[in-house]
Amino acid sequence: MTQISILGCGWLGFPLAKALLQKGFSVKGSTTSMDKIAALRTAGIDPFIVQLGEQKVSDTITDFLANSEILVVNIPPKLRGNATENFVAKIEHLLPFIEKCTVTKVLFVSSTSVYGEDNLHVTEATPLNPDSEGGRQLAV
């Protein structure tokens, strides 16, 4: 059975995890809140508390990634109220753990903010034109 780890089981990651379980996948899910652990477990998701920081990643990351073939990175940059956070540094600290584990495929969930506010049809070929700090950091 394919094991998938979803880093960030919030408004998008949690329903994604439940849908993957229904398709027969084994799913690990992360949250930053102890309050959400029970809900993840009740849904059949193997829950983990994982904290990504600009300086380090929590020790739980190794067990979270262990035996997973696919990693879905689904965490927001959280820059609306705090433009001083460095989302790129957080992802850079995650990379060595991914490189050392069994993950062979990574899906990074981004945001339409990397395209700016042109209100045009967007495809994968659309040039990036971020107009916010979050969009700029995601575009990196």
Task: Please report, for each region that a protein language model flagged, where it lies by residue.
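N-terminal Rossmann-fold cofactor-binding loop
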Residues: 29-35, 51-53
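NAD(P)-cofactor binding segment of oxidoreductase domains
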Residues: 68-107
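Conserved Rossmann-fold NAD(P)-dependent oxidoreductase catalytic core, especially the SDR/UDP-sugar
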Residues: 92-132
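Active-site Tyr-X1-5-Lys
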Residues: 131-140
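Conserved N-terminal Rossmann-fold NAD(P)-binding element of oxidoreductases
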Residues: 4-8
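N-terminal Rossmann-fold NAD(P) dinucleotide-binding loop
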Residues: 13-14
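Aromatic pocket-lining residues of Rossmann-like dinucleotide-binding sites
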Residues: 20
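Conserved Rossmann-fold cofactor-binding substructure of NAD(P)-dependent oxidoreductases
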Residues: 43-68
